[in-house]
């Protein structure tokens, strides 16, 4: 699974996912299914915000790469992928600026057009079940919930899907591609089944124990991709270039 993740996702996404796991004391080299799930969720959050801007009239518009209107305001503020301290700083800033109610849990995005926080979900199960779990956890009507599945289904608060159909179709197509690529490598069953995932986790732990006594050279260098992209990622005036730079799974 780890090889698949590194082949299928942009290096920046993988590094952000690894940082998030380590922040919670989890090992991305062992819990590879969780790493894949976090990478998928991150990419969906980025794709959700791709190309969406707000013009001077306050209208939501879609601007493709290469368009001269690069100074337009991004419609969505991405919160997911930041470390917790920075994420809460962004949330507090948004609340102070817009008057939005501060959420109890960190959301994934903020929609400047609809003036609401958004919680994005990507599930391997039934969308309505995952939606109810999210709603029960958040317990706030102020946070909008939007759930996607790997089968092309989706569910959103009050059936308000926020994005246009084409933008949502891009996300669904990407999720379906990830599923197909996992299946072709024999990874999908363990990604979906808790029992199979537990078996794979034990296998990973055993493999790591065997390698523990072997001398390992650890690189301390920051990857070129992250070194270039991270300043843009942290910049509130980031362009759509970062948002659209994600790699597709290579053909076998």
UniProtKB/Swiss-Prot annotation:
Residues 207-217 have a biased composition (Polar residues). The active site is at residues 80, 108. Residues 203-222 are annotated as: Disordered. The record marks 195, 198-199 as: Important for efficient shutoff activity and nuclear localization. Keywords: Decay of host mRNAs by virus, Eukaryotic host gene expression shutoff by virus, Host cytoplasm, Host gene expression shutoff by virus, Host mRNA suppression by virus, Host nucleus, Host-virus interaction. It is found in: Host cytoplasm; Host nucleus. Belongs to the influenza viruses PA-X family. The probable endonuclease active site in the N-terminus and the basic amino acid cluster in the C-terminus are important for the shutoff activity. The C-terminus acts as a nuclear localization signal. The C-terminus is recruited to host protein complexes involved in nuclear Pol II RNA processing. Plays a major role in the shutoff of the host protein expression by cleaving mRNAs probably via an endonuclease activity. This host shutoff allows the virus to escape from the host antiviral response. Hijacks host RNA splicing machinery to selectively target host RNAs containing introns for destruction. This may explain the preferential degradation of RNAs that have undergone co- or post-transcriptional processing. This is Protein PA-X. It comes from Influenza A virus (strain A/Hickox/1940 H1N1). The gene is PA.
């Amino acid at each position: 699974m780890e090889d698949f993740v590194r082949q299928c996702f942009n290096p920046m996404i993988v590094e952000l996912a690894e940082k998030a796991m380590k922040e919670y004391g989890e090992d991305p080299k062992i819990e590879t299914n969780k790493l894949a799930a976090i990478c998928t969720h991150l990419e969906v959050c980025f794709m959700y915000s791709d190309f969406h801007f707000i013009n001077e009239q306050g209208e939501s518009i879609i601007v493709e790469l290469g368009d001269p209107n690069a100074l337009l305001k991004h419609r969505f503020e991405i919160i997911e992928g930041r470390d917790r301290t920075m994420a809460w700083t962004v949330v507090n800033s948004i609340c102070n600026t817009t008057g939005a109610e501060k959420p109890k849990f960190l959301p994934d995005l903020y929609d400047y057009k609809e003036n609401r926080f958004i919680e994005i979900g990507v599930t391997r199960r039934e969308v309505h079940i995952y939606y109810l779990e999210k709603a029960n956890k958040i317990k706030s009507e102020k946070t909008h919930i939007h759930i996607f599945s790997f089968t092309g289904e989706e569910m959103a608060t009050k059936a308000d899907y926020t994005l246009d159909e084409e933008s949502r179709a891009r996300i669904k197509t990407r999720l379906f591609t990830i599923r197909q690529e996992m299946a072709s490598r024999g990874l999908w069953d363990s990604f979906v089944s808790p029992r199979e995932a537990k078996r794979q986790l034990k296998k990973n732990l055993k493999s790591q124990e065997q390698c523990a006594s072997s001398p390992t050279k650890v690189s301390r260098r920051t990857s070129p991709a992250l070194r270039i992209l991270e300043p843009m990622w942290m910049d509130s005036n980031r362009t759509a270039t970062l948002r659209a730079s994600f790699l597709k799974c290579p053909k076998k």
